[in-house]
Amino acid sequence: MLFEPALKPARLIQRYKRFLADVVTPDGEALTLHCPNTGAMTGCATPGDTVWYSASDNRKRRYPHSWELTETASGQWIGVNTLHANTLVGEALRAGTIPELAGYAHLRGEVRYGAENSRIDWLLSAEGRADCYIEVKSVTLLQHQSGYFPDAVTLRGQKHLRELQAMAEMGYRAVLFFAVLHSGIDRVSPARHIDPHYADLVLQAQQYGVEVLCYGCQLSRHGMRIHTPLPIIIS
């Protein structure tokens, strides 16, 4: 995906109330951005880092600017807008650049399914093949030279794992897909030190047939794309 129109830079002052961030542009203008990320954003919102933001022409929006990327002082790039993870995976599925998920004729997004009334991020189907349910998670937490998910306790994520396991038990393909939106991450693990129940559910779901995939992304102020598979360490 390309950022069009081009993103603009600013210096981060603070993130607060989860969905807001104060920044200062290179010409000294103070702005309040919408922060499209509900997580803890540990390591992604250090005051002084460079924020790259987009602008909306929707006059009804109270905060027309959105925080898209962080460029850290050490030169790492982080995708802050978690909505982009689904978009990136969808683009890669359509292009056939994820070999493990290639060969399906039909792709649908946000399809309702499961006993807990969830929505699957992507559903693949083809004649003669079992439907494939794909749940996408955005990974940005870097600690101890490894990436972790989640960065906070996630009841919603736990529900998604239960739903995926149920689909696998019914004979469908079920895939948990970690999209790594942090240039400094080269491997990923469930964050047992943050949400031990989520980590247990990942291990259990895998034992029942849920596939776990992890791909890194190329990130820049110009755009992003799914790039290369990364190791996933589950214990």
From Swiss-Prot:
Q: What is the lineage of its organism?
A: Bacteria, Pseudomonadati, Pseudomonadota, Gammaproteobacteria, Enterobacterales
Query: HAMAP family in the record, alphabetically?
Result: SfsA
Report disulfide bridges, numbered on this chain.
Answer: none
Alphabetized Pfam families for the sequence: SfsA, SfsA_N
The entry's family comment says: Belongs to the SfsA family.
User: Which species does this protein come from?
Assistant: Sodalis glossinidius (strain morsitans)
Per UniProt, what is the name of the gene that codes for the protein in this document?
A: sfsA
Q: What is this protein called in UniProt?
A: Sugar fermentation stimulation protein homolog
Q: Which InterPro entries match?
A: SfsA, SfsA_C, SfsA_N
Gene Ontology MF, one:
DNA binding
